[in-house]
Amino acid sequence: MVISMRSMDKSDEEKGKWVLLQAPGFNCATIGAVAMIIIHVVVMSTGGIFPDGAEGGLRSLYIQLGLTWEGVSSGHVWQLFTYFWLHGNWGHLVLNVILFYYSCARLSHVLSSSRILVLFLAVSIGSGLIHISAQAVFDGVPKDPLVGASGGIMGLLLAYFALSPGSRMLLIPVSANNLAKGILIASALLFVATPSLGLPFLSDMGGGLVDLLGPGLFQIAHLLHFAGGLIGWVSIPRFFPKLLTLEDLVRMRNQSEIVAELR
């Protein structure tokens, strides 16, 4: 079963066409979103992963399942598979669930659920490895445990942008290709501008952004977003089969009509 959503592709907008997204059902978009919600409800019902003054149980959950270089290098390799199922608060969860569902639903038109799942897991693990590698190399990278699926989701979103570079998202008047480049550039710049890294000029710029927008700006894992987005963006043409474009279909139809006429 599917539901109709307005297409953000310019040509489709002009023709008034509609694009189909998966409705809730037994598919990767729904299963992944529901799993994130259930896990968060269970965690929050017992106090959350950031309880004030917590000791033992909940804090241990955060330390054991959140991702850090110290944890993985100590043998807690499961953190690479668990960190992206936990979220810090409801706002964090809701945003990630919406983007996860949107990305999976769009990708489901050209990729199977199993391939979308493989892509999500590969991007989540790959971006997580890059994040903790930076923790090991740079003293200024926060050493707090990382939680959240945004790295993998960024990979899914930019994978969709790579498959449909001319499409447009609601309220964002640029092509998916340019939006993907903008996201990658912004994420990279925000990472290198992190004040705690102490990079000349860039850290000063980051300090100015903190004064303007608040310290929460650099509590976001910008390197994770950059790494996840880049992996998703470049992996589609390299590791997935070439997808048929509208031009390919038109050419195939014309060829079949010519063959039919010759007969």
Which residues fall in each region the model found?
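Hydrophobic recognition helices of helix-based DNA-binding modules
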Residues: 41-42, 129, 133, 234
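Alpha-helical transmembrane segments of multi-pass membrane proteins
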Residues: 37-52
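Transmembrane helix-loop-helix
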Residues: 80-167, 195-227
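Alpha-helical transmembrane segments
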Residues: 25-32, 90-97, 175, 179-182, ...
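Central hydrophobic cores of alpha-helical transmembrane segments
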Residues: 120-123, 172-187
